[in-house]
Amino acid sequence: MLYNLLLPHVHNSHIANLFHYITFRSGLAIIITLSLSFITGPILIKFLRSLQKNGQPIRSDGPESHQTKVGTPTMGGIMIILSSCLSTLLLADLTNKYIWITLFGFISFGIIGFMDDYAKVTKNNHYGVRGKSKLLLQGIISFIICVLLEYLDKSPSHLLNVPFFKNLSLDLGYFYIVFAMFVIVGSSNAVNLTDGLDGLATVPIAFTAGSFALISYLVGNLIYSNYLQLTYIPNTGELTVLCAGLVGSCLGFLWFNAQPAEVFMGDTGSLSLGGVLGIISVITKHEIVLAIVGGLFVIETTSVILQVYYFKATKGKRIFKMAPLHHHFEKHGWAESKVVIRFWIISVIFALIGLSSLKLR
């Protein structure tokens, strides 16, 4: 909004000229989302506590230390969604189609998560909305997004770029739409599975969003994309502002979500944040890089898949003491804070590996 209002005055005002730069607006987005989180956080937490008498239901079969979390409110992802969307609407170019498509997906996945959290709180159990129902809704939203990208782009690309290899890409044809849907839905659920400890998912999400802030900027810049031999996609640079807002809002949320958490992001936050990262990776044609940068999410999801299939195949045996993987280490006696910080370190390593793929070709 501010960008569009100030754009006509770029040549007449130094301040207006600053808004012409994506980097300036991205930095401002971090400041705004951080500030909004600090201001609205205590108010939202108090409000959620007044509505949720028992807070988020805690699994009885989980680590014993988790019973101290009883009564902690959920749906804190509302804080992240509101601050991120507001900063994007204020600072991004509102004529940019990618901004609106991404915000649509972000909010839509957030609504699915809210429905799930609401069901858990009202029923006072950790099951929420049926898994198949959630997958169906996620599939519908991701399909709408993929169709919009297909028909709004003048020359849609069905190429899957392979990182670390020069000029290596796979033409998936119209199967690319199915693949893109898988990326978006998979990313949403992967982040959801990772969000099981205080602050565990928040920082890796911030690292991933920060990585894609850089990727969006480079892919949307003709000079940089040519230099790095990346697929140039006009107008994706504006997604840098949105990604920066995600970084700020996640760091602001961490203030209240660090152990011992005052609030959980819930599925409202995890499904929406995972979904929006998947959408941005599809738009920027860096789907595989998302799997690298967000490697922690992939590992957590893989641990669940292996556990479930092995349990069924062996009729009751388990690979891990408990899945997702972070609970396995808790069952081994690791303190929650140690699991969280070590997983943060792993996510930093994955982010650096993913970003190195932009240059190593």
UniProtKB/Swiss-Prot annotation:
It is an enzyme of class 2 (transferase). InterPro entries: Glycosyl_transferase_4, PNAcMuramoyl-5peptid_Trfase, PNAcMuramoyl-5peptid_Trfase_CS. It is found in: Cell membrane. Its cofactor is Mg(2+). Keywords: Cell cycle, Cell division, Cell membrane, Cell shape, Cell wall biogenesis/degradation, Magnesium, Membrane, Metal-binding, Peptidoglycan synthesis, Transferase, Transmembrane, Transmembrane helix. The chain crosses the membrane at residues 28-48, 74-94, 99-119, 133-153, 168-188, 203-223, 236-256, 263-283, 288-308, 338-358. One of its GO terms (biological process) is cell division. One of its GO terms (cellular component) is plasma membrane. It is a multi-pass membrane protein. The keyword Cell cycle applies. It catalyses: UDP-N-acetyl-alpha-D-muramoyl-L-alanyl-gamma-D-glutamyl-meso-2,6-diaminopimeloyl-D-alanyl-D-alanine + di-trans,octa-cis-undecaprenyl phosphate = di-trans,octa-cis-undecaprenyl diphospho-N-acetyl-alpha-D-muramoyl-L-alanyl-D-glutamyl-meso-2,6-diaminopimeloyl-D-alanyl-D-alanine + UMP. Belongs to the glycosyltransferase 4 family. MraY subfamily. Catalyzes the initial step of the lipid cycle reactions in the biosynthesis of the cell wall peptidoglycan: transfers peptidoglycan precursor phospho-MurNAc-pentapeptide from UDP-MurNAc-pentapeptide onto the lipid carrier undecaprenyl phosphate, yielding undecaprenyl-pyrophosphoryl-MurNAc-pentapeptide, known as lipid I. This is Phospho-N-acetylmuramoyl-pentapeptide-transferase.
